[in-house]
Amino acid sequence: MYELGVVYRNIQRADRAAADGLAALGSATVHEAMGRVGLLKPYMRPIYAGKQVSGTAVTVLLQPGDNWMMHVAAEQIQPGDIVVAAVTAECTDGYFGDLLATSFQARGARALIIDAGVRDVKTLQEMDFPVWSKAISSKGTIKATLGSVNIPIVCAGMLVTPGDVIVADDDGVVCVPAARAVEVLAAAQKRESFEGEKRAKLASGVLGLDMYKMREPLEKAGLKYID
């Protein structure tokens, strides 16, 4: 059950080195390394392309059409955090724009992940403040109803607990549980190393058919070549 009207000020953040290190590996590699779990729904898209970030989650539960708690959340941000926001019911209003981004950026936030709408996207890009959202909308919000900050939330279908690691890029958004951050970093680095070896073989002209030993199972499945 959601707690409303609360702010947890002391949260256990994931290991900082692990949280920082996952950015370079990207969402797809991290998702695979975790066993293909942790992925937010694919409608969560960056408002502009080219950013690849990771950081520890400060979570926000919002009410439809009301961004009051985003201002409350700003106070809880520490350098290296990513704000993750969910809404109690579906809403695409523009909860976040350049003024809140200025506040978040001053506190050290690396990004915002919000299962709702944002606006001022041109200015946000000029500010180099990345956002992943499900909508872009000029429609503003009010400030009247309490939500909560730093409670477990479900954002775009994924449970996010305060302090978890968020990895986001052009391919999507992944949540890594804080307790698994170090383990997942090691697994993702190992996977990246293997992919580097495969990439070199493919670049040399080796076919995936041979590298992955696909020919025999394809033949057994009934594939026929016709000249």
Swiss-Prot record:
Pfam family, one: RraA-like
Reactions performed catalytically: (4S)-4-hydroxy-2-oxoglutarate = glyoxylate + pyruvate; (4R)-4-hydroxy-2-oxoglutarate = glyoxylate + pyruvate; 4-hydroxy-4-methyl-2-oxoglutarate = 2 pyruvate; 2-hydroxy-4-oxobutane-1,2,4-tricarboxylate = oxaloacetate + pyruvate
EC number: 4.1.3.16, 4.1.3.17, 4.1.1.112
Residues binding Mg(2+): 120
Co-factor binding comment: Divalent metal cations. Probably Mg(2+).
Induction annotation: By growth on aromatic carboxylates such as phthalate, terephthalate, m-hydroxybenzoate and p-hydroxybenzoate.
One Gene Ontology term of the molecular function aspect: metal ion binding
InterPro entries, per the entry: LigK_PcmE, RraA/RraA-like, RraA/RraA-like_sf
The entry's keywords: Lyase, Magnesium, Metal-binding
Binding site for substrate: 97-100, 119
Gene3D superfamilies, sorted: Ribonuclease E inhibitor RraA/RraA-like (3.50.30.40)
Gene Ontology BP terms: 3,4-dihydroxybenzoate catabolic process
Coiled-coil region: none
UniProt activity-regulation remark: Cleavage of 4-carboxy-4-hydroxy-2-oxoadipate, and to a lesser extent 4-hydroxy-4-methyl-2-oxoglutarate, is inhibited by lysine modification caused by diethyl pyrocarbonate. Decarboxylation of oxaloacetate is unaffected by diethyl pyrocarbonate. Inhibited by BeCl(2), CaCl(2), NiCl(2), BaCl(2), HgCl(2), SrSO(4), CrCl(3) and FeCl(3). Partially inhibited by p-chloromercuribenzoate and N-ethylmaleimide. Activated by inorganic phosphate, arsenate, phosphorous acid, acetyl phosphate, thiamine diphosphate, ADP, ATP and diphosphate.
pH-related activity note: Optimum pH varies depending on the substrate used and phosphate concentration. In the absence of inorganic phosphate pH optima are 6.6 for L-4-carboxy-4-hydroxy-2-oxoadipate, 8.0 for D-4-carboxy-4-hydroxy-2-oxoadipate, 6.7 and 8.0 for DL-4-carboxy-4-hydroxy-2-oxoadipate, 8.3 for DL-4-hydroxy-4-methyl-2-oxoglutarate, 9.3 for DL-4-hydroxy-2-oxoglutarate and 8.8 for oxaloacetate.
Named cofactor requirement(s): Mg(2+)
Temperature dependence: Retains 50% of maximum activity after incubation at 54 degrees Celsius for 10 minutes.
Entry function: Catalyzes the last step of the bacterial protocatechuate 4,5-cleavage pathway. Has a broad substrate specificity and catalyzes the aldol cleavage of 4-hydroxy-4-methyl-2-oxoglutarate, 4-hydroxy-2-oxoglutarate and 4-carboxy-4-hydroxy-2-oxoadipate, and the decarboxylation of oxaloacetate. Preferentially cleaves the L-isomer of 4-carboxy-4-hydroxy-2-oxoadipate, and has lower activity towards 4-hydroxy-4-methyl-2-oxoglutarate and 4-Hydroxy-2-oxoglutarate. Does not cleave 4-hydroxy-2-oxovalerate, citrate, 4-hydroxy-2-oxobutyrate, 2-oxoglutarate or fructose-1,6-bisphosphate.
Assembly behavior: Homohexamer.
Family of this protein: Belongs to the LigK/PcmE family.
Name of the molecule in the record: 4-hydroxy-4-methyl-2-oxoglutarate aldolase/4-carboxy-4-hydroxy-2-oxoadipate aldolase
Native species: Pseudomonas straminea
This protein's encoding gene: proA
